Amino acid sequence: MSENNGKQFINGQRVAANAPTIESINATDYQPTGYLFSQATLDEVDQAAQAAYQAFLKYQHTTQQQRADFLDEIAIQIENLGSKLQEVAAQETGLPLVRLQGETGRVTGQLRLFAELLRRGDFYGARIDTALPERKPLPRVDLRQYKIGVGPVAVFGASNFPLAFSTAGGDTVAALAAGCSVVFKAHSGHMATAELVAQAIEKAILNSGIPSGTFNMIFGSRVGANLVEHPLIQAAGFTGSLEGGMALFNLAQNRPQPIPFFAEMSSVNPVIVMPEALNARGEKVAQDTVASFNMGCGQFCTKPGLIIGIKSPAFDQFVTALIDTTRTAVPQIMLNQGTLKSYQQGIDALLNEQGFKCIASGQAPELISQAQPHLFQADQSVLLSGNPKLQHEVFGPMSIVIAVDDEATLLNGLEKLAGQLTATIIADESDLPQAKELLNLLTRKAGRVLFNGFPTGVEVSDAMVHGGPFPATSDSRGTSVGTGAIERFLRPVCYQNTSQVLLPDVLKDGNPLHITRLVNGVLTQN
Amino acid sequence: MSENNGKQFINGQRVAANAPTIESINATDYQPTGYLFSQATLDEVDQAAQAAYQAFLKYQHTTQQQRADFLDEIAIQIENLGSKLQEVAAQETGLPLVRLQGETGRVTGQLRLFAELLRRGDFYGARIDTALPERKPLPRVDLRQYKIGVGPVAVFGASNFPLAFSTAGGDTVAALAAGCSVVFKAHSGHMATAELVAQAIEKAILNSGIPSGTFNMIFGSRVGANLVEHPLIQAAGFTGSLEGGMALFNLAQNRPQPIPFFAEMSSVNPVIVMPEALNARGEKVAQDTVASFNMGCGQFCTKPGLIIGIKSPAFDQFVTALIDTTRTAVPQIMLNQGTLKSYQQGIDALLNEQGFKCIASGQAPELISQAQPHLFQADQSVLLSGNPKLQHEVFGPMSIVIAVDDEATLLNGLEKLAGQLTATIIADESDLPQAKELLNLLTRKAGRVLFNGFPTGVEVSDAMVHGGPFPATSDSRGTSVGTGAIERFLRPVCYQNTSQVLLPDVLKDGNPLHITRLVNGVLTQN
């Protein structure tokens, strides 16, 4: 790290009024890693927001090509960090190096996908209604609409994806692609990782000739709230707990000027196993299910926390296989001490709750930082009564299996679930005739419905939705993964009877950007 | 009116536990029109929301063609109401028959435009990323996204457009097009008008075979709050005052499950007159400006309430022409007694505020229900200090003119303005080189920027934006006029590895609906 280690990133400078006293902690042994950070002052939060606003005034006028090149350059600079990035991230989060290598690829892939999106140009949503001077009873004026960035965006790093949902993660990329500047609040769980990535972004800013305050980063506790309340911040993206998300959401809505606050929060991601699939391959499904809820130590927003099927001998065998596989599951290091404590509290709460019982546990932890996998079984009454304990996300390597009497009970029970990021149906061809009503129900409940896979893989692509009805997110109309994520930070503006000289290229006659536009009700590249 | 006059419209039935005691009032003489309405009970609000929810479960699965036909049928049924509709609306609102005839055309045109939008199919935002089983290091699954309705929507009628922003107005049509059911809260200022239009919608529901609870309407005070707090309501559209809008917005955000609440509220719609335009045609601009702020008795959300130019002899002449024209302006009937009272309070507040003076008044009212037009002049200090009185919308036939020292002062002053629905630049060709920075500034402030026209004409088309930064609306990402209005009530859902048998037609291989879709990053109709 440089001599500036631990200072805020503001307007291309490193700034810190406070001494560096916040310690980066090793996730494995809870000892300091040696990296220290300064708590941002209120004045520094203000400086960061001001810098973002001043940069926005220029950055919003960059061309789509300039922004695409900038995102590509960030990807290169992140690659240039080399293995140091994964090593530091592994220290701070306890995640395995191979996972962090994959996550780095996801970050750079995501940056390049958004660059493609920018070059494609349909994110502008360009619409042109040309003048109809002869129309009766009234002539029509010339109207041209496109989408522009809402302004400076506050982004909150998630603990569980120190790269892909953090400093240069999905929300940051979506905001930068939209033409918005960013103030990023570094997560306390991986500040040194954030520092490295921020340095890469700063280099990309310099290399690309982008305004220096386009990206800013602050460290510290409570500064997130200050940031959300800052009048120059115009939107925010968050990934984290329901409690944390709603606290910030409420601040955002209760400002003198409310702002869009997209929080991705809580989901138990039900998996429904259909009878014929269980008959055909129950044991394999059980193994894959256990692998999915243990993947990344169960620290995925899309971890399948609820497994439901209809009572049958095949389902009993499936549960037996879940138990057997869970018992072989190895303990893994959790992201930090707080996360492990929350996990253990969540497990204890279920152990003490009527209708739930722990039916299998994985191997015992060998390190103080490891979590033991657990499998619970719950009565169907817990589902049918809408018991909030069932719907409370326990972040970590556990899941709950429920057998229901019949299909009607299954549908009744699922109807009681709150909004979800994902819902999964494990089905064979012969199950499909029974799956239609189930699919309709789950479509109302979730942002993504998947068949014969597990929700823990979240592809970054145009068609992905990582969102869903509350409490999965604070606004079901958004996604935080995939190119659709840009929509959260765009607003439409309409120019009426505006001279060609003054119009942006995207709306000019002759379509100089060669993008698809809706012209007089017809999608065209002309 | 039928014998059921005054009861709630719930699930295709007329229901009222309370006696009809709320009077419809004639806007001209403040006497009862004779139509009486029943205050909805809390139980009736619940019945309406339940009916909307049950209908949504079916209505959401109607095809785009079925919904398009339904909207067309509503237009026909509204036309079938004949001149009775405008006569009743004229009684209740004091608006001239010819205006209400035009507004009826706007309503039916809007319904048919949304039917076109549905048939075009791009509102689905269909995106397909096909599986890449050979991709390294990980295969890609098949992902298909489209947009679906968020659920039952609460819609609030606006006082100033008893047809176009009311029962079958922009918000209702956008929600119905999105596949959402509606509970409409009738505005107390035109309940008999609302009753007629609701009857037309009910006929269209019957004729089109649409589920009976797809549209519901309730009467009464405070029921709007009950509606927004009802757990089955999933979004809301509102047009009205800042106070009313924010009260409901706060309820919507503080529910256990917050919901999107799109409120179109407050805007002073600045008009900037450029030097060369004034030199060339100052007197004509003055006449048109006065006509615009008096149109519809100044009761448009887009009324130009602020006129700004740079000091010059031509600007002085322009102000003189504004004064002369204002003095000839005739008084018109306001929508209701409350609106007139608010207008007079707004005028009184300006008369008592330092920095403002009334420089012209129109002809004196002859009826108790008429408003007198007024023109104010304000010091530039009022603009530069961001005086909230200047930014407070005074709903009615008035405007404020300000002369500023120079272009820099103009830009500084405009920077102090809050968000606007519209901003207007009156410019000649030779003004355009100076207009670029102004345009950039106004683009940040407004949802629509227009040249050489007046904002009071709001075309209903694909490219229109009737929205803008707070407090113009509660969310700058939406529009309540034009086909873009549908976006507010749609959310994306993604199907992963889903069988062709179960996929909706919009996402099937072979594109059976022949719509434009984004397939593997390419917009195509294949």
Swiss-Prot record, chains A, B:
<feature type="binding site">
    <location>
        <begin position="185"/>
        <end position="188"/>
    </location>
    <ligand>
        <name>NADP(+)</name>
    </ligand>
</feature>
<feature type="active site" description="Proton acceptor">
    <location>
        <position position="264"/>
    </location>
</feature>
<dbReference type="GO" id="GO:0047533">
    <property type="term" value="F:2,5-dioxovalerate dehydrogenase (NADP+) activity"/>
</dbReference>
<feature type="binding site">
    <location>
        <begin position="159"/>
        <end position="160"/>
    </location>
    <ligand>
        <name>NADP(+)</name>
    </ligand>
</feature>
<comment type="similarity">
    <text>Belongs to the aldehyde dehydrogenase family.</text>
</comment>
<dbReference type="Pfam" id="PF00171">
    <property type="entry name" value="Aldedh"/>
</dbReference>
<keyword id="KW-0521">NADP</keyword>
<dbReference type="InterPro" id="IPR016163">
    <property type="entry name" value="Ald_DH_C"/>
</dbReference>
<protein>
    <recommendedName>
        <fullName>Alpha-ketoglutaric semialdehyde dehydrogenase</fullName>
        <ecNumber>1.2.1.26</ecNumber>
    </recommendedName>
</protein>
<keyword id="KW-0560">Oxidoreductase</keyword>
<dbReference type="InterPro" id="IPR016161">
    <property type="entry name" value="Ald_DH/histidinol_DH"/>
</dbReference>
<dbReference type="InterPro" id="IPR015590">
    <property type="entry name" value="Aldehyde_DH_dom"/>
</dbReference>
<feature type="binding site">
    <location>
        <position position="393"/>
    </location>
    <ligand>
        <name>NADP(+)</name>
    </ligand>
</feature>
<dbReference type="InterPro" id="IPR050740">
    <property type="entry name" value="Aldehyde_DH_Superfamily"/>
</dbReference>
<comment type="function">
    <text>Catalyzes the NAD(P)(+)-dependent oxidation of alpha-ketoglutaric semialdehyde (alphaKGSA) to alpha-ketoglutarate in the D-glutarate degradation pathway.</text>
</comment>
<dbReference type="GO" id="GO:0042838">
    <property type="term" value="P:D-glucarate catabolic process"/>
</dbReference>
<dbReference type="InterPro" id="IPR016162">
    <property type="entry name" value="Ald_DH_N"/>
</dbReference>
<feature type="binding site">
    <location>
        <begin position="240"/>
        <end position="241"/>
    </location>
    <ligand>
        <name>NADP(+)</name>
    </ligand>
</feature>
<comment type="pathway">
    <text>Carbohydrate acid metabolism; D-glucarate degradation.</text>
</comment>
<feature type="active site" description="Nucleophile">
    <location>
        <position position="301"/>
    </location>
</feature>
<dbReference type="InterPro" id="IPR044151">
    <property type="entry name" value="ALDH_KGSADH"/>
</dbReference>
